[in-house]
């Protein structure tokens, strides 16, 4: 469900940027079209889906680098005193809670690490390639995020990124591009950013469908979800992932998604990390191609940060908590009402 929320958020962002160019097209319609279209590409075959993802990775990194270089090469349009604090500081506890909630909201941006672990069984030489993928991927994502946020601050001061109703500007890339380069080039960047979100859907939908396929293969979901077509695509899993994403797109707002998905991903990742500790204790002799160094210190530190971010969200955003609890409740209903009825022992080779 964390991946489903990520798909809905990315699709909603695509729809938000499309609204900038075509205001008469509702966000939900554009987002739904993107999800269905990308799902159809992956349903055709594995080769087509992989080609879309490979092109998407190259295009996204290239566009971000161009935007960063051109942005810093342009004269700053931010109001004076970019980093000044106009409002009085809240109590230390309140500031810590707000900061933790902000971190939770951005957690899904690093979901690539989770994606690598999800498909670890399909990777050649996982003991080497998974480490390289995670370290290199996290380093690149972190660097790009720092630089792109630097460009945003170069384009506008923080208070200029807030709308009259107190909410942040959703299409921040379009806003920054117009401030730095003018309306015409800003529109061009808006179209390119739309393409970035569209291509990002490809990876999220592929990973999500593979998770469903893997669970069905182990007997944790109905067996029909493990069906592959002639070209190796898990069609039924793709359709289910598409349907769940469409439900979220039409039942929630983009702001609610961005505040909730990161927290949900943080929670589910925390549960997975806790599971690693339990598994190491219960099955110490299990073959592990990839081992955590300095165990159990890294998992404990991670779980501590997870608890802090979860507490921060609960203390600052009641609406987000309600949505998260609703999604978790739905997941439990599906698991105990459907999945467990189809579970079967894993066959040993």
Task: Walk through the language-model features, giving the residues of each.
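Hydrophobic transmembrane alpha-helices that form the core helical bundles
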Residues: 1-43, 48, 189-214, 250-267
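TM-loop-TM module centered on a large, flexible mid-protein loop between adjacent transmembrane helices
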Residues: 16, 20, 89, 103, ...
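C-terminal membrane-solvent junction of multi-pass transporters and transport-like membrane proteins
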Residues: 224-235, 269-320
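Alpha-helical transmembrane segments of multipass membrane proteins
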Residues: 17, 36-43, 68, 149-151, ...
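Membrane-interface loop-to-helix entry segments
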Residues: 27-80, 111, 134-138, 261-271, ...
């Amino acid at each position: 469900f964390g991946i489903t929320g990520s798909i809905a958020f990315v699709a909603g962002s695509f729809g938000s940027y499309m609204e900038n160019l075509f205001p008469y097209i509702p966000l939900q319609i554009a987002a739904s079209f993107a999800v269905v279209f990308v799902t159809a590409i992956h349903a055709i075959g594995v080769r087509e889906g992989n080609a879309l993802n490979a092109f998407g990775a190259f295009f996204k990194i290239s566009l971000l680098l161009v935007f960063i270089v051109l942005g810093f090469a342009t004269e700053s349009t931010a109001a004076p005193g970019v980093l000044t604090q106009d409002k009085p500081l809240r109590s230390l506890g309140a500031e810590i809670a707000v900061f933790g909630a902000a971190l939770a909201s951005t957690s899904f941006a690093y979901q690539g690490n989770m994606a690598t672990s999800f498909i670890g069984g399909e990777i050649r030489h996982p003991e080497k390639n998974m480490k390289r993928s995670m370290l290199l991927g996290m380093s690149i994502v972190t660097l790009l995020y720092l630089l792109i946020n630097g460009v945003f601050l170069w384009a506008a001061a923080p208070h200029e990124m807030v709308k009259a109703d107190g909410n942040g500007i959703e299409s921040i890339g379009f806003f920054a591009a117009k401030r730095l380069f003018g309306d015409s080039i800003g529109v061009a960047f808006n179209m390119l950013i739309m393409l970035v979100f569209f291509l990002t859907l490809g990876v999220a939908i592929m990973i999500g469908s593979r998770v469903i396929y893997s669970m069905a293969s182990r007997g944790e979901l109905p067996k029909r979800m493990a069906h592959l077509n002639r070209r190796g695509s898990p069609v039924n899993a793709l359709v289910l992932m598409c349907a769940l994403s469409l439900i979220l797109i039409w039942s929630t707002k983009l702001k609610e998604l961005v505040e909730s998905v990161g927290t949900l991903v943080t929670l589910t990742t925390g549960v997975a990390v806790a599971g690693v500790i339990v598994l190491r204790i219960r099955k110490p002799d299990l073959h592990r191609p990839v081992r955590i160094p300095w165990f159990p210190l890294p998992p404990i530190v991670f779980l501590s940060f997870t608890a802090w971010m979860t507490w921060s969200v609960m203390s600052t955003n009641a609406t987000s908590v309600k949505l998260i609890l609703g999604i978790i409740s739905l997941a439990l209903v599906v698991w105990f009402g459907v999945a467990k009825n189809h579970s079967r022992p894993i066959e040993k080779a």
